[in-house]
Swiss-Prot record:
Entry GO MF terms: ATP binding; ATP-dependent protein folding chaperone; isomerase activity; unfolded protein binding
The protein's role, per its UniProt record: Together with its co-chaperonin GroES, plays an essential role in assisting protein folding. The GroEL-GroES system forms a nano-cage that allows encapsulation of the non-native substrate proteins and provides a physical environment optimized to promote and accelerate protein folding.
Gene: groEL
Compartments, as annotated in UniProt: Cytoplasm
The protein's name in its UniProt record: Chaperonin GroEL
Amino acid sequence: MAAKDVQFGNEVRQKMVNGVNILANAVRVTLGPKGRNVVVDRAFGGPHITKDGVTVAKEIELKDKFENMGAQMVKEVASKTNDVAGDGTTTATVLAQSIVAEGMKYVTAGMNPTDLKRGIDKAVAALVEELKNIAKPCDTSKEIAQVGSISANSDEQVGAIIAEAMEKVGKEGVITVEDGKSLENELDVVEGMQFDRGYLSPYFINDAEKQIAGLDNPFVLLFDKKISNIRDLLPVLEQVAKASRPLLIIAEDVEGEALATLVVNNIRGILKTVAVKAPGFGDRRKAMLQDIAILTGGVVISEEVGLSLEKATLDDLGQAKRIEIGKENTTVIDGFGDAAQIEARVAEIRQQIETATSDYDKEKLQERVAKLAGGVAVIKVGAATEVEMKEKKDRVEDALHATRAAVEEGVVAGGGVALLRARAALENLHTGNADQDAGVQIVLRAVESPLRQIVANAGGEPSVVVNKVLEGKGNYGYNAGSGEYGDMIGMGVLDPAKVTRSALQHAASIAGLMLTTDCMIAEIPEEKPAVPDMGGMGGMGGMM
């Protein structure tokens, strides 16, 4: 076991804060409509230009172990916010940096870090409640487009195309983002469905950048039991291999020898296959397998109806134009199923919704209708160069996540205004403990930081703008894009309430952990001895 470097107290906390500041300062320049670009060097290919906070954060590793720990903890803030809300990563990073900076002053002055953290937690809980109260539902296409535009760095075209996609496939429908072939963004709606099961082994991945397994023109084998013996599968695998097409296997589970053989065949390029577990449980699993069968024009191979895996033929398999399998989701695009059968299946499920008694059953049945009838909307991002394409795709994906979050929990005034207005909930919050009250004050000041950073990136004077916004009420704020003051929602500057809430909660959570840290342990790298020089080669012995 390698030796460890163990450090305590203010000195190591300061190193951790240095790491926080290095990462946060790189991320914060991207915030707001006039946020700047960050250029990231890549080992292969051209540099990556981005305005996406989490992309910048993921690229940062620091040489000093203790500084790096601080940076990695803030990276977790951005990453968690991105996972939950899909956007707000830069706001979360700016909030975390502010809470840590303010909190460290109090810790250094001798206040109890645990009480400070309790005060921060109480303040955040009050702010979250207030954000819920001031959030407005986001229902119309216009509001959805506005949210999308803001998240895509004020690109109105992106907002409009996302609103159109949601209109076509419904708010529950599946929307994916792909590279386009032209200079313009395009929207393509294809019949398809998505379910929440991913590949059973990462060795099935064939697109390392997206971390997915993509199958073009595949067969689909649907089986309602476990597959562990490869001999059961061999007859159908041989038929698929002769057809020179990939295969997706959807079964209760694929394990042991069967999974190992599929992985080896895939790696060697003998037969491109991917195995996923069937979605749902019990009777719902059977129903969803049947949905996929109807969509792809195949049948569910089940002993209950007298079909066995060994006797399966290509006629029993479903087919699709393309299937994408990620870590957690599988998307079937353009199944070869009969349109009349799909419509009949949807009508049948809708009848079940009418007779269902529990809300849970109704919700699950509605999900199935959305998957069968809604289809998949594909946004094809257009750009002149590959570097621009990557940057635009980052923004479109951010905007898509933001609009979903807005539909879920409603919208609040954007541009950092909602957090300032939610401060009202803290003004009368007294904990009865001086150190906890100091924790509340830390959050009270930190909620100004996103607006301050937006103004700074736009070349304005943060203190002047914050004071003027605080003089106003409701949605009154500063639109950094146009340089005007006014009703933020009226000007179309909106943020999803879920994004603002997640950013605040995750920032406070990690910052609180940092403030209560008193010891850090890092591995001491072993010094490797220098390789000795090679001795000189002997002479050739006077050979002629």
